[in-house]
Amino acid sequence: MVETGKTICSGGTAPGKKPIVVSDWEGPWVSPDHAADIARTKLPRGGELWSALSNYALYLSDVKHVESFQPGGTLGLIAPFLITYDVGERDLNEMAIQDARFIVGALDAIDFLQRTGHSFWVVSTSYHQYVWYTAQIAGISQERTRCTYFPIESLQRDVKEHDKELVREITDQVADTAVRKLDKFKREEDLPPNVREAAETLNDLFLQRLRRSSFEHVLRTVRPVGGQRKLDSLHEILRLEDRSIKEAAVIGDSITDRNMLGETKNNKGLAIAFNGNAPAVENANVAVMSYDCTVTPLLIQIFGRAGIGEIEHVTMNWSPETLKREVSIGNLDEKLFARFLEPEVAKRARAIWVTGDNMKRVIDESVKHREEVRGGVAGKLT
């Protein structure tokens, strides 16, 4: 355990080493949802299609337990529709440029972390076109990203026209299932008849008919990096860096991050849910609710200098006075604290240590912040 108020601790990072930062991208640093925006603007009934397939992806991973489907699987399920309706590389790249909107303070926070010796990695479910473009703006090299690779134009060449016709024929039928809320049930036997019918329709399409078509290669190639695949990426990065998970600051905001957040939390690393939804908050030890990213490097610096016990103390007693004390004992740089004290930051930023007792309240507050910061479809994503 860490003795609070000290810079010496038995856990945390080794002397001279800074915590390694492994973070989701959409949510903690950028506000749009690139794939959802592509679907909404480029596909007929795109918003409904996205909702339907998001619900179905969670049904496959959490109810039907299909091993090949992880949280975030929507990006694989929507791929046949994007190909059918002639969405191309140019469309994905143009939307990446349009969606390059960073949360306030994000670029400064990332720059600070990298300048002060933190190894910064992005692990995102998003398509590579978006992650590579926006990460480059933030000064993060392509090699330090792990995301969903979607070579859309090479995949398009392999798809037969009669298989595209199949997708066109069932587009309305799939979009209609959005109202069935497949993601609201925990067990197959709990599905009401109308919801079960929607599930069977989608199962027949994605687990049978498309698997027997030229789209099989598409479904096999587009493997969204979410859930267990994010955790696998975290393990890979730790091996590459020769670091322990207890030296990691892992940041996420959604169900796609629950595995890597949960394992980090269980191993006494810093697991931050930044404006997270319920699955993220449930698997984090710290929930951040903020319109500004300055709080993230602040927490990472305290964690690196004094360990997870000091983070618990600070976030259970969150206030400018508590943080000022961290400056006085050498756990926090005065300049970073001064940036936090700027009125629009301190007034609107909170960090809370997540416990069983405060879980429901924290989730409610965090989800509200999430919808306000990300807005629209992105704010409501699971």
For each feature predicted by the language model, list its residue ranges.
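Alpha-helical substrate-recognition element adjacent to the catalytic core
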Residues: 2-163, 287, 291, 349, ...
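C-terminal cap/substrate-recognition subdomain and adjoining C-terminal extension
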Residues: 4-6, 104, 108, 116, ...
